[in-house]
């Protein structure tokens, strides 16, 4: 009996630093985007530890599935260790989520910049990057919702492994449900990564356009 890997990989990062083009609209936008990049430091910093924790938990689970309930003491110890790993990664995801959420106020500054800008083309460009950033946050919220739901299902599965009243069929059904929900998590992670790629593309297009207009 196997469980699919549920490693959360958000390897695409928001590369926003190093944009300096003088004053006016492009400089103000560059400053806002750099603020967003800095605010996401915690998001970037937890990725390696999160992946490592998930990998250890996955390895533990595979070992637990090879044990029988007759090996109760060993199984109980492994379940406790694995539950601790799960709690650790949820704390990391919470830190990651707080980092992403903290960018909301900076994104709102783009809306203010739209109001300040007189050029119609610049307004449209700014609205486009604001929209892409907000869509990225929305995509990340979907990731965390699905990820936390998956973690709850995994917690229930771990409890079943040491529950003498839980038969093999019940455990197999829970594994199936976990794997199905894991697919949903992977889909939402891909959606978030695609949204991040889109932000970076729009950012490059908009800043290049603003720089040309300023000449």
Where are these regions (language model features)?
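N-terminal hydrophobic targeting signals that begin at the initiator methionine
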Residues: 1-2, 20
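Sec-dependent signal peptide recognition
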Residues: 2-10
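C-terminal motif of bacterial Sec signal peptides marking the signal peptidase cleavage site
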Residues: 15-18
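Immediate post-signal-peptide N-terminus of mature secreted/exported proteins
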Residues: 21-94
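Primarily heptad-repeat coiled-coil rod domains in cytosolic scaffolding/tethering proteins
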Residues: 24-27, 31-34, 70, 77-84, ...
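Amphipathic alpha-helical coiled-coil segments
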Residues: 36-50, 89-96, 100, 140-143, ...
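Extended amphipathic alpha-helical interaction segments
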Residues: 96-178, 185, 197-209
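Short, solvent-exposed mixed-charge patches
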Residues: 213-215
């Amino acid at each position: 009996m196997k469980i699919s890997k549920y490693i959360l990989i958000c390897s695409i990062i928001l590369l926003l630093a190093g944009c300096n083009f003088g004053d006016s609209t492009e400089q103000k936008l560059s400053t806002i985007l750099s603020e967003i990049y800095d605010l996401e430091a915690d998001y970037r910093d937890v990725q390696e530890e999160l992946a490592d924790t998930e990998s250890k938990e996955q390895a533990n689970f595979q070992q637990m599935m090879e044990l029988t309930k007759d090996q109760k003491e060993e199984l109980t110890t492994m379940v406790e260790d694995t539950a601790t790993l799960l709690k650790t990664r949820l704390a990391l995801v919470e830190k990651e989520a707080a980092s992403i959420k903290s960018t909301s106020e900076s994104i709102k500054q783009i809306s203010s910049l739209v109001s300040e800008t007189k050029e119609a083309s610049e307004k449209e460009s700014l609205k486009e990057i604001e929209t892409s950033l907000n869509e990225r946050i929305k995509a990340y919220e979907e990731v965390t919702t699905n990820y936390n739901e998956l973690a709850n299902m995994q917690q229930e599965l771990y409890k079943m492994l040491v529950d003498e009243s839980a038969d093999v069929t019940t455990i197999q059904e829970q594994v199936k449900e976990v794997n199905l929900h894991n697919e949903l998590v992977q889909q939402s992670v891909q959606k978030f990564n695609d949204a991040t790629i889109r932000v970076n593309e729009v950012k490059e297009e908009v800043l290049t356009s603003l720089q040309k207009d300023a000449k």
